[in-house]
Amino acid sequence: MNVNLEEILDIYENIIYKNSRNKNKLYNFEKNKMSILYDLCYKLNNNIYDIGKYNIFLIKYPKYRIIMSLSVTDKIVNHYVTIKYLIPVLSKYLDNRNIATRKNMGTDYGIKLIKKYIEINKKYDKFYILKLDIKKYFYNIDYVVLKNMLVDYFEENVYDLLCKIIDSTDEEYINTRINVIKSNVNSNKVNDLPCCEQYKSLPIGNMTSQFFAIYYLSGLDHFIIHNLHLKYYIRYG
């Protein structure tokens, strides 16, 4: 890889620093910021970077979810590979009706599409809107399938880094921590919170996870739109 300090510093200052809610993390990072970033560049350029452990916690709004939060350094890498590699290389394979977490798209764009589709179909006496949801989608993303979808598009060192990110939840401490959280919450809602199966599941919250999720079912999007000819279609997630 050819990672330069300016790119890494820009991601930290304009994305991580501005959007992080954990000010203690930032405070500790700031004390040795430049030395940490120099070290990170060295590790990435020499293919010796490894992902640290996740901070795993529960959120209750808008619904109960397990969140896995990376360290500041790992968040920088996560954003870097998404911005530098995933989006530029893979976006051309995504249909514009696949709208989640994409620039100039998202929920507002989805609402516009729905309104447009309804107006178009008002010429018919009757039409239907079908809404489907994939249960525990992020937890059911298969590592092997996802890696096979990536391997032909990236150089070996970039692909290896992407695989490290994908594999980062395949660790025993993850489920141990999830089970501790569930045991400490007095609510039936935690019963539906899944643990991570071996070779499956992406952490909710990572930028890479968000992009992997929209890319993972891109083949399904094309099948529905072009093979089934269902052109009034939107996928969010």
Name what the model sees in each region.
Residues M1-N46:
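Non-catalytic, polymerase-adjacent accessory regions of viral genome-replication enzymes
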Residues E6, M34, Y38, D74-H79, ...:
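Non-catalytic, well-ordered alpha-helical scaffold segments
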Residues I16-Y27, F57-M68, D95-R97:
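Glycine-/proline-rich flexible loop or hinge segments
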Residues S35-Y64:
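Active-site-flanking structural segment that lines cofactor/substrate pockets
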Residues G52-Y54, I234-G237:
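Short Gly/Ser/Thr- and Asp/Glu-enriched loop/turn motifs at secondary-structure junctions
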Residues K63-N96, C196-N227:
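Conserved pre-motif C helix in the palm subdomain of viral-like polymerases
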Residues T82-D142:
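Active-site-proximal segment of RNA-dependent polymerases
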Residues K122-Y236:
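Conserved polymerase palm-domain catalytic core
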